[in-house]
Amino acid sequence: MSKKFIITWDAMQTYCRELAEKQMPAEQWKGIWAVSRGGLVPGAILARELGIRYVDTICISSYDHDHQRDMTVLKAPEGDGEGYLIVEDLVDSGDTARKLREMYPKAKMIAVCAKPSGKELLDDYVVDIAQDTWIEQPWDMSIQYAEPVNRKQK
């Protein structure tokens, strides 16, 4: 993927607050199930914004940094998902979301970002991303010193 969409910490906070507003009233939710690892930060922000104290994880492995591979369920809460928000940072191909729908047919599945191949599997999301674009999440980046241009030429 040659295109990149960079999400800053500030933008992630803003997107998650917008996503939280769509989940009101908060009292309808028993808890949040954050999909590890991408959904952990959005899940924490949503828990704060909605005043939800019960947060658990669904651990599914399907990526090695930028390469998708076979899916493995490492940890999964019991039940059909009724009353729970399943939170992801991104729905890309839809493979993980499809698996989650099978496992938890009554949960509400939400994500911060969605690509065309997977967005129909979501109940809510806030940012549309082109299918050929790689997302750089704030937890995958660091701020570094950049040499001034005039010093690079010497």
From Swiss-Prot:
UniProt-listed SUPFAM superfamilies: PRTase-like
Catalytic activity: GMP + diphosphate = guanine + 5-phospho-alpha-D-ribose 1-diphosphate; XMP + diphosphate = xanthine + 5-phospho-alpha-D-ribose 1-diphosphate; IMP + diphosphate = hypoxanthine + 5-phospho-alpha-D-ribose 1-diphosphate
Annotated positions binding guanine: 92, 135
Subcellular location field: Cell inner membrane
GO BP, one annotated term: purine ribonucleoside salvage
Functional pathway: Purine metabolism; GMP biosynthesis via salvage pathway; GMP from guanine: step 1/1; Purine metabolism; XMP biosynthesis via salvage pathway; XMP from xanthine: step 1/1
E.C. numbers: 2.4.2.-, 2.4.2.22
GO cellular component, one term: cytosol
GO MF annotations in UniProt: guanine phosphoribosyltransferase activity; hypoxanthine phosphoribosyltransferase activity; magnesium ion binding; xanthine phosphoribosyltransferase activity
Swiss-Prot/TrEMBL keywords: Cell inner membrane, Cell membrane, Glycosyltransferase, Magnesium, Membrane, Metal-binding, Purine salvage, Transferase
UniProt: Mg(2+) binding residues: 89
Chief place where the protein resides: membrane
Record family assignment: Belongs to the purine/pyrimidine phosphoribosyltransferase family. XGPT subfamily.
Annotated HAMAP family: XGPRT
Main function: Purine salvage pathway enzyme that catalyzes the transfer of the ribosyl-5-phosphate group from 5-phospho-alpha-D-ribose 1-diphosphate (PRPP) to the N9 position of the 6-oxopurines guanine and xanthine to form the corresponding ribonucleotides GMP (guanosine 5'-monophosphate) and XMP (xanthosine 5'-monophosphate), with the release of PPi. To a lesser extent, also acts on hypoxanthine.
Protein name: Xanthine-guanine phosphoribosyltransferase
Taxonomic lineage of the native organism: Bacteria, Pseudomonadati, Pseudomonadota, Gammaproteobacteria, Vibrionales
Name of the gene encoding the protein in the UniProt record: gpt
